Swiss-Prot record:
Keyword Calcium among record annotations: no
Taxonomic classification: Bacteria, Pseudomonadati, Pseudomonadota, Gammaproteobacteria, Pseudomonadales
EC class name: transferase
Name of this chain's protein: 2-C-methyl-D-erythritol 4-phosphate cytidylyltransferase
Molecular functions (GO terms): 2-C-methyl-D-erythritol 4-phosphate cytidylyltransferase activity
Translocase among keywords: no
PROSITE patterns listed in its UniProt record: ISPD
SUPFAM superfamilies xref list: Nucleotide-diphospho-sugar transferases
Pathway connected to this protein: Isoprenoid biosynthesis; isopentenyl diphosphate biosynthesis via DXP pathway; isopentenyl diphosphate from 1-deoxy-D-xylulose 5-phosphate: step 2/6
Keywords linked to the UniProt accession: Isoprene biosynthesis, Nucleotidyltransferase, Transferase
Length: 235
């Protein structure tokens, strides 16, 4: 199957601060099993034979990136981090364009603090979307019962979970289409929290590709502790 997978670029926006972690540094630089979350996220892609290259969006005043082992890796280019995720991703796409990437190239955007992406999920995403006219994302069907809250912290309704999915990353779209969608959102002051939202706003419907539920994003301290315990079991 590897020989049939499409070539792709990876983009990792890593300019956020992760305030909910209440840590002494941005969460992408917290340690897991001897290296940072960002390094683990990069590891998910750098050994893949279909990878064309990686762009990481880093804040201009980031003091941590220069000390990482990947900071001088020739496979990785750096883009300026923006105020919002969409700005950071758009800057990375501009770097790809400057490198000669084409509008028809596939781009996979992945969270810097999502270090547990399985190679099987990455290959599944590439395989299932290789000929898709829009692109799509890894996602997981909702498992728990979902409640809608009122303004007073009480349940106002139970949501039908049969149509609800949790959006994960990577999210895979053509470079040109993603660039146009993000640029249009920024010009129109439309706030999007992931790339699929921008594609949706442009009138297209991304495809959902079911992935593993342990491909979690580290958002709170207990997420990192869960990963530490899980990874300790690998030894």
């Amino acid at each position: 199957m590897i020989n049939t997978l499409p070539a792709f670029w990876a983009v990792i926006p890593a300019a956020g601060v992760g305030a909910r972690m209440a840590a002494d540094r941005p969460k992408q630089y917290l340690e897991l099993a001897g290296q940072t979350l960002l390094e683990h996220s990069l590891d998910c892609f750098l050994g893949h034979p279909a990878l064309a290259g990686v762009v990481v969006s880093i804040a201009d005043d980031d003091p941590y990136w220069p000390g990482l082992r990947y900071a001088s890796d020739p496979r990785i280019q750096r883009a300026a981090g923006g105020r919002e995720r969409a700005d950071s991703v758009l800057n990375a796409l501009l770097v790809l364009h400057a490198q000669g990437a084409s509008d028809s190239d596939w781009v996979l955007v992945h969270d810097a603090a999502r270090p547990n992406l399985a190679r099987s999920d990455l290959d599944k995403l590439l395989s299932e979307l290789a000929d898709d006219p829009v692109g799509g994302l890894l996602a997981v069907p909702a498992r728990d019962t979902l409640k809608r809250a009122d303004g007073n912290g009480r349940v106002s309704a139970t949501v039908d979970r049969s149509t609800i999915w949790q959006a994960y990353t990577p999210q895979m779209f053509r470079l040109g289409a993603l660039h146009r969608a993000l640029a249009e959102c920024l010009v129109s002051d439309v706030v999007v929290t992931d790339e699929a939202s921008a594609i949706e706003w442009s009138g297209q419907a991304p495809r959902l590709v079911e992935g593993r539920s342990d491909n979690i994003k580290v958002t709170r301290p207990e997420d990192l502790e869960w990963l530490r315990q899980r990874w300790a079991g690998r030894r």
